[in-house]
Amino acid sequence: MIERDVMEYDVLIVGGGPAGLACAIRLKQLKADLNVCVLEKASAIGAQALSGAVLEAGPLDELLPGWREDPPGICIPAKRDEFSLLTKTGKIKLPVPPQQHNDGNFIISLGLLTPKLAAQAESLGVDVFTGFSAAAPLFNDDGSVAGVQIGDMGIEKSGEQGPNFAPGPEVRARITVLAEGCRGSITKQLIQRFALDANCDPQTYGLGFKELWQLPPGRVEPGLIQHSIGWPLDNRTYGGSFLYHLDNDRVYIGYVVGLDYEDPRLQPFEAFQQFKHHPSIKALLEGGEIVAAGARTISAGGWQSMPKLEMPGALLIGDAGGTLNVPKIKGVHQA
């Protein structure tokens, strides 16, 4: 039996994304003497944060009323929306669905917003630990969730303990909040253990790709938000694109493909590359360069696929609970 250190908190939050950090901030605002901890597996807050992202600002205004005075590094007011159906060589402009009007919203970077949220949480007394991944849930004698065990360090390729082995501590709390994002390892175990998905539709998932491009001068319309459906996907495959115009001749470009696609030959990343060769997109990107790129999965089932969010000793928030608003194509404000 490995001897492990034990850390104890009132509330343990697993995941340092927008949901986890907003939860920590709000808890301390409501009850300053709570002992709150946030665990983030990435080496730094924001290092693995990835989203479109268009922010509906109302919830952030309520959480941090002064955030607009010191916004994150990328924070562009939305100016105009476009929605199109792409064919192989052209595009047909469609009415923008009412849920996708972005007046009053902002194009942001989650990778820049989350460090600001973490700094705010720490200023309120929250312990934020990066580089620590939760390896297993812990349970009380009555079966309720008691916290998590941090992964062991110094394990050899063979699975044996190496010379630098350090056992991961146990982090125990009265309440554990799972904010791991889509398909988190602890979340999956607890959904199964407590049958949280017994009375909802099966969750569906999408795989999203995103790139930040630096373009030649004069092509970008800051605040323009463009979405498209259609080519290169067939009409049996769920998916589409986003193109968000930033300042300083930069754009976010991305593509999402539903992972329930039927065609075994479909490769989502290849579909993204095809999309960038569409005449309207190629003309925009030609001569530019990719500054950053990433990919992630999203929970895309919507309201009917949300599991039960609470269980004895724990609850799910953010994408761990499938809170993405699919008609709006937004989830950060829900988180």
Predicted regions and their residues:
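Conserved Rossmann-like nucleotide-cofactor binding loop
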Residues: A19, A44, R183
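N-terminal Rossmann-like dinucleotide/flavin-binding domain of flavoprotein oxidoreductases
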Residues: E62-L63, P72-I74, R80, I108-S109, ...
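FAD/FMN-dependent oxidoreductases across multiple families
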Residues: T237, D263-P264, P268-Q334
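Redox-cofactor binding/interface segments in oxidoreductases and associated redox assembly factors
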Residues: V14, L178, L316
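Helix-loop-beta segment of a Rossmann-like dinucleotide-binding subdomain
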Residues: K91-L112, A119, G147, V256-G258
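N-terminal Rossmann-like FAD-binding beta1-loop-alpha1 element of flavoenzymes
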Residues: D10-C37
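N-terminal FAD cofactor-binding segment of flavoenzymes
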Residues: K41-K88
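Predominantly flavin-linked oxidoreductase catalytic cores and closely associated redox partners
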Residues: Q120-A283
